[in-house]
């Protein structure tokens, strides 16, 4: 069958056409590692194609074993492009090949010369492959109508003439190897259908074609159709008021005495979780991990990671500001004084040039950090933490001043960082990634410098210094043109070096801010592009798990969750942070999907929160309001001896999860303009 365009409409024909954009093959049959047509393999393949409107088609395919013998096979649906794509995508896995980054995560279309085949549950759209050029976009993806249709895998093959083969494998296959852990490859994984003589199998899949909304953005067109393909019918597990109570309860537990002062620690975990994650150079073999999983001393909660971090995962500054908001609301002077003291402790460490170590504990480890190289991620100042730090300090200064407390050192903290990056902005690489304490650029790669944009704009709101706003506008143009406009962001998740979704956050926020400040429509387009990119990492459907999995036992589902990065194939509740920004997009564009997606991400971020003191996960009572950071939906893990336990939780109860939800609620009113939190109720 040929898909072609006639009078502006997409149509199917059995006749070969020069105007065709794609060709749908009958079912292929893989047996003994060889692909055959259904006819040659002794199978009958019949299709029924439903036109769902606006270039979306559902293919219902029925396959019959006519060979007269029982067959153990894989089935393969194949769609061939009749155009030459310039970009390709497998959402949450491959963004035009993941050419940025030096790790051993998947890159390109092949491994050792053989095409990658990835399971559906690694992708936000099941078994989705997308190719595009300036004029046409084409996608093939699985249906969730039944388990045979959903439990699939996807592959893309580039042919010598530049055209592509989109493939869906039935059932699940991971080949030629399995990406099973951080930068780790293990043996391939195979499932098969066993079909007796005369037995039928019916499956469904989707084909989508479009003219890309913007160049490199056919994914935006595809995402626009997802609500009708995978309808969202859930609601929030808790009211917003209860979310605030639970989150604040947990964050207060993280106030930690440290060398005569109080700081905010990054989280609580078990000793085994700490070792599993590979912190402090620990390397556990699978055998050691299995042994330690049975020892009580390694499986009780405590403060096993002494981490005090400005932003990123620890979110110490944001947590302090949220405590100040809570203290002011409740007239809790002790809590307010504690939060202010914590920020004073941090501010005292900053150098005149604005540089500061983003991890406070490293001042104790190395009294002269300028004399030591970056021994681990985050040792030296990097733009993710510096951006968060300056942004939050500016907001803290404004909040306290509004409530009668002048803390000029907090504003000075923010302006020092902003002054540094105004002076050191590069037209070649923006704000860079890693800096020395002396102010020398150590690593200029990636998109992570975008976090400085929020710092500049938030500090401008307090100081009205035009150089901050001007530099932010210039830098946003740079990062959009170099990165976001090409549907990629890199290195915002500073524990990995890969294409990721976190780095899109500052571009969404700063673009919306500049749109509201200037009224320039280009910034609204910027915000939409960055938001579409971010949402390409969101799960549009619920993957399937056995009853014995953590996901099934504790009521976790994937729809609305966000994949972490091309290096870390797991889900986290990061989308909660973008909830108010998607509400802003809804208000500015009038497009209802932004509100729907905001609610999807918000609702999903509430799954796994401990709502009653002493609730147990993995047999361990968890603190009220806590939630684990990682949800491992596919055959990838850092927290199990092997990757086979799909659908498990880790035990790292980190602070940013609560901090992001609470700041989202605060911004829903303070920034998005809602009167209260009822929009998320």
What do the PLM-derived regions correspond to, one by one?
Residues 2-412, 416-419:
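Carbohydrate-recognition beta-sandwich/jelly-roll modules
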Residues 369-380, 394-466, 528-536:
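Active-site lining segments of carbohydrate-active enzymes
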Residues 247-308, 348-378, 421-442, 480-498, ...:
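Glycine- and aromatic-rich loop/turn segments at beta-sheet edges
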Residues 330, 350, 400, 418-421, ...:
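Alpha-helical junction/boundary sensor with strong preference for TPR arrays
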Residues 529, 573-583, 593-635, 639-649, ...:
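Exposed, low-structure sequence patches enriched in small/polar residues
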Residues 8, 317-333, 388-406, 451-466, ...:
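Well-ordered alpha-helical scaffold segments within catalytic/enzyme domains
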Residues 442-453, 483-485, 495-508:
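Aromatic-lined, polymer-binding surfaces characteristic
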